[in-house]
């Protein structure tokens, strides 16, 4: 966590995994467009994977809006808001809003990772944000039924 999430949480950085994921998206979209030009590529992520997916997809929009059209839905669970990191990556507010139209976040108010960098109203954050509440109102660090795990919902 320290080497990945903490770096993002403290500095709103463009994380190394997202840079690699962006390269993979570019490559896979090129192949997909050649083999199935009408197909869409859906992206999902949980926890650190939300930061990776969100930054990679947003960077794709920034670099190549035409390739971004191949992205279908981006569905993310229990992840931090990446808005400031996208600004730090050189994206404009207009680009962030446009890229966010395909992104849906499901966040949990009892989960530490879900609430990272969520300091503005949800409508001002990247993507569409839906709040979900765990069945037992558990927190992130509880060993049984952690609110950060999928099975708790």
Which stretches of residues belong to each language-model region?
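A conserved cap/lid and substrate-binding interface adjacent to the catalytic center
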Residues: 1-44, 64, 68-73, 84, ...
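Gly/Ala-rich beta-loop-alpha elbow adjacent to hydrolase catalytic centers
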Residues: 44-49, 53
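Active-site signature of alpha/beta-hydrolase-fold catalytic machinery across serine-
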Residues: 55-59
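The feature captures the conserved acid-bearing segment of alpha/beta-hydrolase catalytic domains
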Residues: 69-153
């Amino acid at each position: 966590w320290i080497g990945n999430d903490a770096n993002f949480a403290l500095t709103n950085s463009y994380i190394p995994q997202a840079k690699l994921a962006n390269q993979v998206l570019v490559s896979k979209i090129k192949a997909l467009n050649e083999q199935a030009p009408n197909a869409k590529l859906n992206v999902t992520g949980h926890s650190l994977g939300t930061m990776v997916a969100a930054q990679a997809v947003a960077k794709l929009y920034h670099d190549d809006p035409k390739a971004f059209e191949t992205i279908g839905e981006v569905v993310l669970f229990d992840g931090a808001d990446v808005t400031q990191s996208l600004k730090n990556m050189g994206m404009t507010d207009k680009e962030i809003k446009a890229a966010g139209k395909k992104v849906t976040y499901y966040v949990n108010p009892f989960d530490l990772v879900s609430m990272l960098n969520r300091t503005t109203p949800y409508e001002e954050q990247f993507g569409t944000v839906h709040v979900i509440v765990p069945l037992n109102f558990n927190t992130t660090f509880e060993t049984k039924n952690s609110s950060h795990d999928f099975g708790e919902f």
